[in-house]
């Protein structure tokens, strides 16, 4: 297995729509294993953060694959479940605003509004079709990762909301960005060429 790397903004591949996976073969299984390894490698370098999930486009692989950590509260639980060709079939419930971060958007966090409930259908890596009913943090994480498959980043949902952006300090505390115009709105490293 050749280890890939996590790509970050403004890499244009993060803005492209991913292709459906036609067949779950060794190449796809290798991509999934790379995603798991990279997620844990990233986490090991970020002591205050937990790698909850990842999408294949974050490695520059434009395939509709995501992985979600089985327990997003426990760093010791390093198991991720892969979902292939995930599709949102329904969102419901009130919209809830909460913090999100992203391996591909370094050092920036945001308060993003998302539906509280979501239904998703997908295939597991062994080819079984699954239907997921998720609420809260799992719903948020599924929506965030499926956005990646459509070339959408969490920052796109809050681009014009000055008070929605945060940075993490050296102690792991999230603090509002000080200069929205410079750090967010006019930051070419976030948005790239438009």
Placement of each model-derived feature along the sequence:
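Positively charged
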Residues: 1-194
């Amino acid at each position: 297995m050749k280890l890939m790397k996590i790509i970050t903004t403004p890499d244009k591949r993060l803005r492209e729509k991913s292709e459906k996976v036609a067949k779950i073969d060794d190449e796809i299984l290798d991509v999934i294993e790379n995603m798991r390894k990279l997620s844990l490698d990233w986490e090991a370098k970020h002591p205050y953060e937990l790698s909850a999930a990842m999408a294949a486009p974050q490695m520059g692989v434009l395939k509709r694959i995501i992985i979600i950590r089985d327990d997003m509260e426990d760093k010791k639980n390093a198991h991720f479940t892969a979902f292939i060709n995930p599709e949102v079939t329904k969102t419901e419930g009130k919209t809830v605003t909460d913090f999100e971060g992203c391996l591909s958007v370094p050092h920036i966090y945001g308060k993003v509004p998302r539906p509280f409930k979501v239904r998703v259908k997908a295939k597991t890596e062994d080819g079984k079709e699954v239907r997921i009913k998720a609420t809260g943090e799992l719903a948020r994480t599924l929506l965030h990762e499926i956005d990646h498959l459509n070339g959408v980043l969490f920052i796109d949902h809050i681009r014009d909301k000055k008070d929605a952006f945060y940075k993490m300090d050296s102690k792991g505390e999230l603090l509002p960005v000080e200069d929205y115009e410079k750090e967010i709105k006019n930051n070419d490293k976030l948005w790239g060429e438009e």
